[in-house]
Design a protein with these regions (language model features):
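Regulatory input/activation interfaces that engage signals or partners
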Residues: 2-150, 161, 171
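Signal-transmission/dimerization alpha-helices at domain junctions
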Residues: 155-176, 217
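A cross-family signal for key residues in well-ordered alpha-helices
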Residues: 157, 209, 222, 240, ...
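Regulatory hinge/linker segments at domain boundaries
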Residues: 176-206, 263
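Short alpha-helical "packing" element that flanks the helix-turn-helix/winged-helix DNA-binding module
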Residues: 204-211, 250
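Short helix-to-turn junction characteristic of helix-turn-helix DNA-binding domains
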Residues: 211-215, 254
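Recognition helix of helix-turn-helix DNA-binding domains
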Residues: 214-249
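Residue cluster at the C-terminal edge of the helix-turn-helix DNA-binding motif
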Residues: 240-245, 253, 257-261
Length: 265
């Protein structure tokens, strides 16, 4: 691993980032600083309120392509299938977290991964997370077209303490001097809580949500403290009530509940 603090450009980039604490360009500067040491394809800074809707603070694409429609779909309710969002809501500790740490056992076989994550977040993801007490959590996501290897994780672990400290200090400065709304907040309904509520029982709703997030029957049984056979019975019943027979159809219904046509991505 190279010495992170030997090159003049490193010192200059870090200084520029510190200068932007509490300012609009903070996130972009922090992302550019991280790119000096590690290649990644996209980055996303988010705030996830404990109660309320998430807000995108910075969207970065290394190729300059971007996809506003994909971001709009995520913010309209798809974020509720994001394992990092769930981890933030469950108050995972501050620091660097890998996808494998937070994702359900069959996440890479889920429709969310196959139809959204793999196309827009790409192959792998890590996040720096800062808990904001009762108000929510702050995250900085880095996405990559190939897996982050052990050397990459090691490098990110080295810089993690001061990255997290900068994020926390930036948010503190904003809370002391609130910035005007950016217009990026989306007023949307809680699609996950409404999805299927008219026809499914509370237990069936719970299982439908876990299916969408990528949990296997075994993992669902462990999480809910019931048998895998009971899970399978509930799955059959909820599929019958929704007149579907597969996870792809369940995912399509969820997209429709967000106002998105799955036939027109």
């Amino acid at each position: 691993m190279h010495n992170l603090f030997t090159e003049a450009s490193t010192h200059a980039g870090l200084a520029r980032t510190v200068e932007q604490i509490g300012q609009p360009r903070f996130w972009r500067q922090l992302i550019l600083l991280l790119q000096q040491w590690l290649a990644f394809d996209n980055a996303l800074a988010m705030v996830y309120p404990r109660a309320g809707l998430p807000r995108a603070l910075e969207i970065f694409d290394a190729r300059g392509e971007g996809n506003p429609e994909a971001m709009a779909l995520y913010l309209s309710g798809l974020y509720q299938l994001d394992p990092f969002y769930q981890a933030c809501q469950e108050r995972i500790g501050d620091g660097l977290h890998r996808l494998e740490e937070v994702a359900p056992d069959q996440f890479r076989q889920s429709e969310y991964y196959l139809k959204y994550f793999h196309d827009h977040v790409l192959e792998d993801e890590v996040q720096f997370i800062v808990q904001l007490g009762e108000s929510g959590a702050l995250s900085l996501s880095l996405g990559r077209r190939e897996r982050f290897d052990s050397a990459s994780h090691g490098l990110l672990a080295v810089v993690c303490p001061w990255v997290v400290a900068l994020m926390a200090q930036h948010w503190l400065q904003l809370s002391l001097c609130p910035a005007p709304a950016t217009g990026m907040a989306h007023q949307v309904r809680d699609a996950m809580s409404l999805f299927g509520a008219k026809v499914l029982s509370e237990r069936e709703l719970e299982i439908a949500r876990l299916i969408l997030r990528g949990y296997s029957s075994k993992a669902m049984a462990e999480r809910l403290a019931i048998s895998p056979e009971t899970i399978k019975v509930h799955r059959r019943h909820l599929y019958a009530k929704l007149d579907i027979s597969s996870q792809p159809e369940l995912f399509s219904l969820f997209l429709q509940s967000l106002g998105h046509d799955p036939q027109d991505p």
